[in-house]
């Protein structure tokens, strides 16, 4: 078992197959390139663990990324929730077995599985929260989801011992590191994707998104903040051939000092 830890940001990554010095591992990982446009589904080759502090709740959370069968999708499993007990008999989830195409087996009781889909998104204020029909939530999933998408991962079970994904260093880079340590495995199933056939525009307040037909995946972004600290206000990113890792994953969440008190009064930014 290998170990890599960064105490500067309070996060720890545990569980590589062989012990390597971080510098040696970094050189090896830099040679790995993933193409998000591949036609086959992918999962992780091995399970890998990490822990860190959650941004908004401030709690320390343990997380494990596990391989999953084709067509599973990205599913979060809240392992911190106790199953329902009736007359001394456990009638819930978590028995160490795996069923339903790689998902933890579930009997009756509270459903602790939360699939990461557009229709399970329940809140997007300051972070993205998903929620299942039983009311079980997982918050601040956006950096992990970006890393999974950017590295071409279609199927994974995310075991999370808490209500929120750890913030790590405020970017997607630690999650990319996790994925590369675990390795990728191609699956014998075609990737299912949404193809944009015509121009789509969405406006909401001062925000706007435009989707255009394309044979690949590229993103053009513009932001506007009343702050001299933000120099670059626009950018173009091509997500082919490792573009996410090269150009995007190290971008970190930022905030303004004037907003800290308000966020903490709302019970946010506790980490």
Regions found by a protein language model. Give the residues of each.
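C-terminal regulatory domains involved in ligand/effector binding and gene-expression control
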Residues: 11, 15, 19, 25-154, ...
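Intrinsically disordered, low-complexity regions enriched in Ser/Pro/Gly/Gln/His and often acidic
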Residues: 3-4, 13
């Amino acid at each position: 078992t290998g170990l890599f830890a960064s105490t500067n940001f309070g996060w720890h990554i545990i569980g590589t197959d062989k012990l390597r010095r971080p510098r040696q591992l970094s050189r090896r990982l830099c040679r790995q390139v993933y193409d998000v446009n591949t036609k086959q589904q992918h999962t992780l080759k091995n399970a890998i663990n990490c822990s860190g502090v959650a941004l908004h709740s401030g709690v320390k959370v343990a997380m494990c990324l596990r391989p999953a069968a084709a067509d599973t999708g990205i599913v979060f499993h809240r392992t911190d929730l106790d199953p329902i007990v009736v007359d001394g008999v456990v009638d819930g989830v978590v028995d160490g077995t795996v069923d339903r195409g790689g998902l933890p087996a579930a009997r009756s009781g509270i459903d602790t599985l939360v699939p990461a889909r557009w229709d399970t998104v329940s809140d997007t204020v300051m972070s993205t929260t998903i929620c299942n029909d039983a009311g079980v939530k997982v918050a601040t999933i956006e950096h992990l989801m970006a890393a999974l998408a950017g590295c071409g991962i279609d199927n994974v079970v995310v075991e999370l011992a808490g209500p929120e994904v750890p913030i790590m260093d405020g970017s997607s880079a630690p999650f990319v590191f996790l994925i590369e340590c675990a390795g990728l495995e191609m699956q014998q199933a075609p990737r299912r994707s949404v193809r944009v056939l015509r121009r789509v525009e969405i406006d909401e307040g001062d925000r706007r998104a435009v989707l255009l037909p394309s044979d690949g995946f590229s993103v053009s972004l513009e932001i506007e903040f009343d702050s001299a600290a933000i120099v670059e206000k626009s950018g173009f990113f091509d997500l082919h051939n490792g573009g996410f890792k090269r150009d995007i994953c190290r971008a970190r969440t930022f905030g303004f000092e004037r907003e800290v008190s308000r966020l903490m009064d709302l019970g946010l930014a506790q980490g």
